[in-house]
A protein has these predicted regions:
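SAM cofactor-binding core of SAM-dependent methyltransferases
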Residues: 1-40
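A generic short-segment signal for beta-strand/edge and adjacent turn/coil regions
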Residues: 1-4, 55-56, 96-101
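Extracellular structured ligand-interaction cores
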Residues: 2, 59, 124-126
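Short, flexible, glycine/charge-rich loop motifs used to bind or transfer phosphoryl groups or to couple energy/partner
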Residues: 4, 21-23, 46-48, 76, ...
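Charged/polar, solvent-exposed surface patches and flexible loops
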Residues: 7, 44-48, 101
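Short amphipathic alpha-helical surface micro-motifs
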Residues: 13-19, 53, 108-112
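Active-site segment flanking the S-adenosylmethionine/decSAM binding pocket
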Residues: 31-95
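C-terminal substrate-binding/active-site "lid" region of AdoMet-derived donor-dependent transferases
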Residues: 66-131
């Protein structure tokens, strides 16, 4: 999906992160990094490499658990520019409202996406936070 974002945002530089070192790559306007989403030190080690860069858009398409979403947000939101957008994808209905409670003091919306496939109804939600 990183290549899709690069092609969609013609002037953007894309930064990706994954826990699977075997799928990391660098390509035209794309850099990927190893990050353990539930380890604050791992997240902050990545941000140290990009100390002078802030982001317009951040998309969490990681582990899809409450804890992982919370930890990544807590250690990454400071890298979002003013008026930037932070998106957590594929949020399960099992912890959607826990995340909503966590984000109650932030400007956020919950997007419940419908699907014709029954198995997609459980984790086809998003939380969008605007700085």
């Amino acid at each position: 999906s990183l290549r899709v974002w690069r092609d969609y945002f013609k002037n953007a530089n894309i930064l990706g992160a994954d826990i699977d070192k075997n799928i990391l790559f660098n390509d035209h306007r794309i850099k990927t990094n190893y990050v353990d989403q539930i380890n604050p030190k791992s997240i902050n080690d990545m941000w140290e490499k990009y100390n002078n860069i802030d982001f317009d858009l951040m998309i969490d398409d990681g582990l899809h658990t409450f804890e992982a979403g919370k930890i990544l947000f807590e250690n990454s939101f400071h890298k979002l520019k003013a008026k930037g957008i932070y998106v957590i994808e594929d949020v399960s209905h099992l912890y959607l409202y826990r995340l909503a409670e966590f984000f109650k003091d932030y400007n956020h919306i919950i997007v419940k996406l419908e699907s014709s496939k029954a198995n997609l109804l459980e984790d086809n939600n998003m939380i969008i936070i605007k700085k």
